[in-house]
From Swiss-Prot:
Belongs to the MESH1 family. Its cofactor is Mn(2+). CDD domains: HDc. It comes from the Eukaryota. The gene is Hddc3. ppGpp hydrolyzing enzyme involved in starvation response. Residues 32-127 form the HD domain. This is Guanosine-3',5'-bis(diphosphate) 3'-pyrophosphohydrolase MESH1. It is an enzyme of class 3 (hydrolase). One of its GO terms (molecular function) is metal ion binding. Mn(2+) binds at residues 35, 61-62, 122. The active site is at residues 65-66. Its EC number is 3.1.7.2.
Amino acid sequence: MGSEAAQLLEAADFAAHKHRQQRRKDPEGTPYINHPIGVARILTHEAGITDIVVLQAALLHDTVEDTDTTLDEVELHFGAQVRRLVEEVTDDKTLPKLERKRQQVEQAPHSSPGAKLVKLADKLYNLRDLNRCTPTGWSEHRVQEYFEWAAQVVKGLQGTNQQLEEALKQLFEERGLTL
């Protein structure tokens, strides 16, 4: 597909197209694409990640879970390695929400190194977003519950990337949580 820059832009363009009708749950209703771009940016700028497969997976991490995208489609455009990472970080939306959350906690320690990086950056982005503003319809109690659940997931991802883990640890400590 050409240079790594071209591959990254292809993934960003694909994700932007797939998420084009979606908005974040913040009061401003920011475009959803800001989230996967932000996750990829955390990986490059804060964790020092340059692995193109991991960065493409970060950009695509919610396409299968939250749009009509299939894993076969991801593989067709981006290859088997990207597909595997996206598959690892995709929740099964046919399951009830509590079961999906339980599975994330249970499966975190068994994830591949690349999937662990995407999960850490995803949690970091979401937790920073929650600190920035409460999503529409969320109580402060629900925000705290999300932090508590995220801390359980992150516990299973420890030993992956010191920079991301330190940033997350600080956010948890501000909420009275420890890993």
